[in-house]
């Protein structure tokens, strides 16, 4: 494996050997209750709580994040979004399974993680489970614009889901340092990627609002095409894809990071002598 101090991959400088990946899209093969928008970037379950399995249109590149944002929730169901990878070509399936867990996984060559409101973090080897459950601290976004997972470096800014600023929202969070949504909340952002290892296998990682949950599956066949799996299950009704840029952070993004360090709460941005467009960008509107 690459030296941890030498983070490479899609988050590193672009080169002919590692070009920017194409925009992510959902596959035209999906569960019976899924309605896909014309662009292939939004998937909505139109009835029931099942038959909501979706796939990426193309296999993922190593270190490429398939990132979704929860757009709609539906009350009355128990359970949440499920996320993972499969080495099965969606086009080769005789029928899309009703559930990703256990149906798709039981077909083999598929690894799926059920997202819960708590306890999504996977303990590292030798790490107590209680210690793994403690979040690493969302303020890292303000000092480190990249998320580092094994040998890959991924721009963190678009990985983080945030609630829309409200009239009293500044009383409920300490600006963006603590304004990280619960994993299953509306506007929360969740992603999946794989990281190859020297032995020819790969680790699957789940990202929730800019934080790596650790290797939720090991021993994946890195040499085989791996498609993302998104199960729009139960209380999760609709998701949309979020596109990432893997180069250097834009000047606009760096400006936002600096501004966030110097204001007390979100409403304070309104009194700054800045163009309205930049204010809206800083407030994630």
From Swiss-Prot:
Q: In which pathway does it act?
A: Protein modification; protein ubiquitination
Ranges for the region named Disordered are: 1-28
* Expression by tissue: Expressed specifically in skeletal and cardiac muscles.
Keywords in alphabetical order: Cytoplasm, Ubl conjugation pathway
Please classify the protein's predominant subcellular localization into one broad category.
Answer: cytoplasm
What is this protein's function per UniProt?
A: Plays an important role in the process of myofiber differentiation and maturation. Probable substrate-recognition component of a SCF-like ECS (Elongin BC-CUL2/5-SOCS-box protein) E3 ubiquitin-protein ligase complex, which mediates the ubiquitination of proteins. Probably contributes to catalysis through recognition and positioning of the substrate and the ubiquitin-conjugating enzyme. During myogenesis, controls the ubiquitination and degradation of the specific pool of CTNNB1/beta-catenin located at the sarcolemma.
Q: Where is the NHR domain?
A: 23-244
Q: Where in the cell is it found?
A: Cytoplasm
Which GO BP terms, alphabetically?
A: intracellular signal transduction; myofibril assembly; protein ubiquitination; sarcomere organization
What domain comment accompanies this record?
Answer: The SOCS domain mediates the interaction with ELOB and ELOC, while the NHR domain may be involved in ubiquitination substrate binding.
Domain SOCS box residues, every copy: 250-285
**What is the protein named?**
Neuralized-like protein 2
The protein's matches in InterPro entries, at most eight in alphabetical order, are given as: B30.2/SPRY_sf (IPR043136), Neuralized (IPR037962), NHR_dom (IPR006573), SOCS_box (IPR001496), SOCS_box-like_dom_sf (IPR036036)
Question: Which terms in the GO cellular component ontology are assigned?
Answer: muscle tendon junction; VCB complex
Domain of life of the organism encoding this protein: Eukaryota
Name of encoding gene: Neurl2
Known partners and oligomeric status: Probable component the ECS(NEURL2) E3 ubiquitin-protein ligase complex consisting of ELOB/Elongin B, ELOC/Elongin C, CUL5, RBX1 and NEURL2. Interacts with CTNNB1.
